[in-house]
């Protein structure tokens, strides 16, 4: 059966690279062919993300066409006026991204829906911001974000500008399953329903970026920046200029988009070594901080000088700096700040002191957006997750690494104007709220083993961890997350959390404590790993 299916795919596949793969599979080992055609790539709240390869388990044009057909069918059935409001489509510079975007537009047009393509490779935040600005009923961003170079992905937003949450993901997945990937109708590329937008969509986003600034009377400072071979470079420079900030000193060899990411092992600012080049540029130039966007520019990494050396800020530390700045320089009883269960609880203390509503959500910005939409009487002014995702204004309802870079530069400039540094500001936050320490540990496991490991912990939680008593276990079943409190709940207690990753073959452990040495917290995470 797999051989017949592969032959059918070969006849329908429009991409010559994929056709070559299929020919090699058909000429090769039967078991490998069988494995490649066993099942299909499943659509979830994160959309699709997988290696670029032929067959139903990879990212390729037939899978994208099938996915687009299901998505458009769902929108036409559930959103009034969907065909007229249309779908907005963006793409990054990864391999096949433009092809996948154009195929999505052609599928939409074939089913009578207007399709709007962004004019060139652009950051994910530009796509997310323009969904509401243009009144689209949905948005599609073709990107694998900070995944390895072999991957690509397909991220879906609804008309609110927020990523999908259940039950939309299941309904869209069910709609996708109704289509044969080898037999999806596509319109001609010159269809009147397909429109390629001009640069005004970028200009309007950049105009909005100016409103992110909260304290304009701060001194100019030097900032080093890297786009990490992604699509953020040009937009980030324009954003800094429009916001009245000095032009960043860029890492030249990483500034232009390059699908091969030649100078980084993993194009993710969180990964060890990924920011080495921008830190070196910052050090040589005497910059006050080093900034890095991931390849689709929805995340922000930050490094700061401490004495004669530099250190990477943890995602929570960036969140504390941005959060305190926003809370200090905004007003109103209707303000709302949001973070996730696995991020630090310190933002909650900040919100309480400033009299601002606060909520914790499941992991992922889709849930942060969901919280903002549920609190329609509130104004979301800041949100973050510890994985370098930051929302610093009320739109878009997604993380924005470029807007965050602009505001972080302002935070650093204000600190300098007030006679301190970003490290000094963190010290002030610790004095005011307590010295929160956070840590993470990732354990590589295939997805099924990861689920089993968390289930075992759920059914038989430990009584002690490294000699410390487990006083409470909280089970967030919908998020598949377990929270274990050691010593006491809150206060001086230690909070350990465990969950299987939704996008990678690993189980993630998170820790937080107050007034504890980082090495001690890390040893507790290692002890929890041993129990897994």
List the predicted regions and their residue ranges.
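Conserved phosphate/anionic-ligand binding catalytic regions in large, soluble enzymes, centered on
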Residues: 37-57, 144-145, 227-239, 382-388, ...
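Gly/Ser/Thr-enriched, mixed-charge loops and adjacent short helices
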Residues: 13, 32-41, 152-282
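An N-terminal, well-structured beta->alpha segment
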Residues: 6-104, 196-223, 231, 497
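Phosphate-binding and adjacent anionic-ligand microenvironments
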Residues: 283, 288-289, 309, 329-502, ...
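N-terminal small/polar loop signature for handling phosphorylated ligands or for N-terminal nucleophile
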Residues: 88-151, 239, 244-302
């Amino acid at each position: 059966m797999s051989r017949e299916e592969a032959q059918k795919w070969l006849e329908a596949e429009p991409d010559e690279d994929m056709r070559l793969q299929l020919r090699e599979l058909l000429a090769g080992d039967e078991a490998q062919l069988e494995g490649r055609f066993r099942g299909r790539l499943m659509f979830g709240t994160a959309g699709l993300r997988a290696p670029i390869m032929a067959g139903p388990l990879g990212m390729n044009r037939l899978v994208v066409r099938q996915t687009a057909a299901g998505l458009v069918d769902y929108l036409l059935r559930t959103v009034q006026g969907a065909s007229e409001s249309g779908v907005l489509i963006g793409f990054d510079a990864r391999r096949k991204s433009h092809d996948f975007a154009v195929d999505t537009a052609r599928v939409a047009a074939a089913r009578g829906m207007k399709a709007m393509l962004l004019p060139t490779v652009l950051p994910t935040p530009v796509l997310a911001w323009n969904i509401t600005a243009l009144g689209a009923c949905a948005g599609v961003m073709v990107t694998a974000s900070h995944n390895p170079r072999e991957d690509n992905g397909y991220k879906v937003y609804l008309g609110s500008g927020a990523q999908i949450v259940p039950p939309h993901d299941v309904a869209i997945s069910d709609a996708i399953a109704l289509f044969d990937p080898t037999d999806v109708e596509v319109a001609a590329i010159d269809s009147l329903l397909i429109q390629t937008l001009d640069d005004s969509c970028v200009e309007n986003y950049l105009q909005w970026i100016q409103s992110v600034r909260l304290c304009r009377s701060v001194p100019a400072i030097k900032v080093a920046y890297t786009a990490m071979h992604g699509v953020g470079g040009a937009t980030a420079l324009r954003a800094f200029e429009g916001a009245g900030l000095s032009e960043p000193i860029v890492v030249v060899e990483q500034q232009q988009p390059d699908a091969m990411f030649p100078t980084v092992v993993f194009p993710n600012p969180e990964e060890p070594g990924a920011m080495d080049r921008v830190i070196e540029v910052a050090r040589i130039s005497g910059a006050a901080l080093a900034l890095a966007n991931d390849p689709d520019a929805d995340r922000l990494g930050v490094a700061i000088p401490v004495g004669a050396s530099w250190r990477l800020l943890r995602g929570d530390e960036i969140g504390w700096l941005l959060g305190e700045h926003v809370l200090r320089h905004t007003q109103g009883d209707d303000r709302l700040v949001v973070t996730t269960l696995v991020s630090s609880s310190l933002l909650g203390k900040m919100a309480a002191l400033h009299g601002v509503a606060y909520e914790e959500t499941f992991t992922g910005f889709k849930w942060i957006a969901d919280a903002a939409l549920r609190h329609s009487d509130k104004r979301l002014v800041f949100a973050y997750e510890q994985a370098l995702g930051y929302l610093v204004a009320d739109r878009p309802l997604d993380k924005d690494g470029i807007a965050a870079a602009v505001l972080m530069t302002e935070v650093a400039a204000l600190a300098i104007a007030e006679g301190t540094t970003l490290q000094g500001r963190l010290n002030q936050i610790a004095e005011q709220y307590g010295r929160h320490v956070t840590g993470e540990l990732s354990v590589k496991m295939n997805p099924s083993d990861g689920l089993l490991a968390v289930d075992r912990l759920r059914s038989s939680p430990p009584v002690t961890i490294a000699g410390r008593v487990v006083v409470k276990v909280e089970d967030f079943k919908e998020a598949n997350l377990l929270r274990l409190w050691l010593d006491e709940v809150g206060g001086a207690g230690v909070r350990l959390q465990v969950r299987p990753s939704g996008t990678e073959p690993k189980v993630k452990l998170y820790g937080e404590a107050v007034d504890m040495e980082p090495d001690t917290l890390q040893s507790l995470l290692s002890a929890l790993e041993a129990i897994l």
